[in-house]
Amino acid sequence: MNVSWALLAVVLVLTVATYECRPRGRILGGQDSKAEVRPYMASIQQNGIHQCGGVLIADKWVLSAAHCATNSSNSSLNVMLGAISLSKPEKYKIVVKVLREIPHPLYNSTIKHHDLLLLELSEKVTLSPAVNPLPFQNENIDISAGKRCLVAGWGQMRLTGKKPDTLQELWVPLISRDVCNRRNYYDNEITANMICAGESRKDSCEGDSGGPLVCDGIAVAIVQGGFRKCGNPTKPGIYTLIEPYKSWIMESMYNATLQSNPSPL
């Protein structure tokens, strides 16, 4: 009898361990993307290593998250576009140096407010079936809770730190701000400029930060960073809405263009 109970205890321990080791990455529960399906996706890299996601919004501009910035006057970042695989050769894959990093001036790394970053590329990219900008939300439209939107990235897939070589994508439901601000969720930390999305064991994670949340073919928000256990139903993914920052985006792009191409006296 004692042996039987010992065996049962071992089985229970192994079962719990197996459950805890299931993937919990941000793009947890996702699937491989396909070539040319997400031509707006960008991999922001430092020394050839993927750091964050991003979204191509113009032929010389990528939108990402402010916590992905290097905080250096001379950017050491590169952006990979036209890729599904981070390592394998692909027909339209290109790597472009970042000329300028423009984090939102009010970004607060402690509370993650205004977590947006504009990256000006060193050259205009040649558009192709695998490299194409995505329009972003510029109208103040409240998207209904429960709507399923797409998030993609090369972020962490397991708590062990495993990251994919192939772009992962996942449809996640939006969660109302009222629910996300409940005490057992984020306890009133979600501002009017943020939105939550995700469900149990379906989420985005470390390395997906900066990538877009896409609803009806439009980038509506950007994946935030944060210290949380990915895939936790009461700690869903937090995203920075793009629409409240449309003026900052357009003005920053315009001013940077003027600096790069000053008018003759």
Curated annotation (Swiss-Prot):
UniProt GO BP: proteolysis
InterPro entries xrefs: Peptidase_S1_PA (IPR009003), Peptidase_S1_PA_chymotrypsin (IPR043504), Peptidase_S1A (IPR001314), Trypsin_dom (IPR001254), TRYPSIN_HIS (IPR018114), TRYPSIN_SER (IPR033116)
Peptidase S1 domain boundaries: 27-254
Enzyme class: hydrolase
PROSITE patterns, sorted: TRYPSIN_DOM (PS50240), TRYPSIN_HIS (PS00134), TRYPSIN_SER (PS00135)
Pfam families reported in the protein's UniProt record: Trypsin
GO CC, alphabetical: extracellular space
Signal peptide extent: 1-21
UniProt protein name: Serine protease ami
Gene field: ami
